[in-house]
Design a protein with these regions (language model features):
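Noncatalytic scaffold domains of N-terminal-nucleophile
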Residues: 1-35, 39, 47-224, 229-291, ...
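Internal maturation/activation junctions in enzymes
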Residues: 3-6, 218, 235, 239, ...
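Long, structured ligand/cofactor-binding scaffold of large enzymes
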Residues: 39-41, 378-379
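Short amphipathic alpha-helical interaction patches enriched in hydrophobic/aromatic residues
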Residues: 41, 211, 307-310
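Flexible, polar/acidic helix-loop-strand segments at domain edges
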Residues: 294
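Protein kinase glycine-rich loop
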Residues: 298
Length: 383
């Protein structure tokens, strides 16, 4: 590389230096998590070890965006395997979450908040699977930084503080266990103040301890950590809370949960092939329909029928076409997507040129305000 000439951009004009190097790069949405990821590389970990350590710290420092109760679709490429892969980290709904059960509760839709909305939390098992099959480290190596920041605290970011403020009354009046964590001293933590989550630190510390007590190699310890999460004290606590507690949700009424320890024990994260779409000289990879990610692939299939190269990328025509194609793809999501373990999703048809050529005919120079799914024989399409 010539001195002063960037390999990324040969004619750079930036107010910040471009990130280049020969050792490794870590990026995340929080500087502490990024630093932990880089430290993991410097300790000899590989990219997957760094990703796992970074992810666990993000749960601590950005609790308004993710946490141990969440899900995670992972798209990865391991040079040793030579192909992109997906880890499904989307836990299923509880076995008891049937239409009959919600009808019995007087509900015609699953509440968007509260215990009834809870699925099997897929995050922990997913990161452990990634660590086992692609990483090199033990659970203690990737969890220790998160435990430290959860126990000792970190400067809470403005958006986390603001998000807690929006649910302050709800936590104070109806979610006392959440209030105990997120309203220290009974108040919303101001931006920049030191914020700790010692309950989370205790949880991960116990998992690390029980995994280490299992002895053996790293794989045995990882498997023990997964078991502790899905069949041990974590699953037991979730089961007990959902059975014994009722908390108010978006319906305005208190409800208990349907998630059980048996639901937790039945599910594990798994590796699968991505769904792909060839667009120009690129192959775009997304997780399966369970992630809703293939909506983007259908948007590309719709856009393929237009000469975008000749358009201003910030001009009204370019933006209009992108928005209208997105509307059609999302309408098809509403009509055809579902859990592939229970629903046959016609994804090959939804990504086909024949189908999308017909869908493009709906796009005019006028913005549509209607939800317009397609119609496929044997699959309905009505919403």
């Amino acid at each position: 590389m010539r001195a002063g000439v960037s390999r990324i951009n040969p004619n750079p004009f930036t107010t910040r230096p471009e990130i280049e190097g020969t050792f490794g790069v870590v990026t995340s949405t929080h500087w502490i998590a990024t630093a932990v990821g880089m430290a993991t590389l410097e300790k000899g970990g590989n990219a997957f070890d760094a990703a796992v350590a970074t992810a666990f710290v993000l749960q601590v420092v950005e609790p308004h965006l993710n946490g141990p109760g969440g899900d995670v679709p992972v798209i990865l490429h391991d040079v040793k395997r030579g192909k992109p892969e997906v880890i499904c980290g989307q836990g299923p709904a509880p076995a008891a979450a049937t239409i009959a059960r919600f009808t019995e509760l007087g509900l015609d839709i699953v509440p968007g908040t509260g215990l009834l909305a809870a699925c099997v939390p897929g995050m922990f098992d997913t990161w452990m699977l990634l660590l086992r099959d692609y990483g090199t480290m033990r659970p203690s190596d990737v969890l220790t930084p998160a435990i430290s920041y959860a126990r000792n605290g970190h400067p809470i970011v403005e958006r986390a503080s603001a998000t807690i403020a929006t649910v302050e009354e709800l936590f104070r009046d109806h979610w006392p266990t959440s209030a105990a964590v997120y309203l220290p001293d009974g108040n919303v933590p101001p931006p920049g103040s030191m914020f700790a989550n010692r309950t989370l630190a205790d949880t991960y510390e116990r998992i690390v301890r029980e995994a280490a007590n299992a002895g053996g190699d790293r794989v045995k310890q990882i498997e023990r950590a997964r078991q502790v999460w899905s069949q041990g004290f974590v699953a037991e606590a979730i089961d007990r809370f959902c059975r014994t507690q009722k908390v108010i949700d978006v319906t305005g009424a208190p409800h208990g949960g349907l998630l059980t320890g048996a639901d937790m024990a039945r599910w594990q994260a798994h590796v699968e092939a991505p769904l792909t779409y060839d667009y120009g000289r690129y192959t775009v990879c997304k997780a399966g329909v369970w992630s809703q990610g293939p909506v983007l692939l259908q948007q590309l299939a719709l856009l393929r029928g237009y000469d975008l190269d000749g358009m201003d990328p910030i001009g009204p025509q370019f933006i209009h076409l992108q928005v209208e194609c997105a509307k059609l793809a999302f309408a098809d999501r509403e009509a055809f997507y579902g859990d592939p373990d229970f629903v046959k999703v016609p994804i090959d048809t939804l990504l086909s040129e024949k189908y999308n050529a017909e869908r493009r005919k709906l796009i005019s120079n006028k913005a549509s305000m209607d939800l317009r799914p397609g119609s496929l024989t044997g699959f309905g399409g009505a919403i």
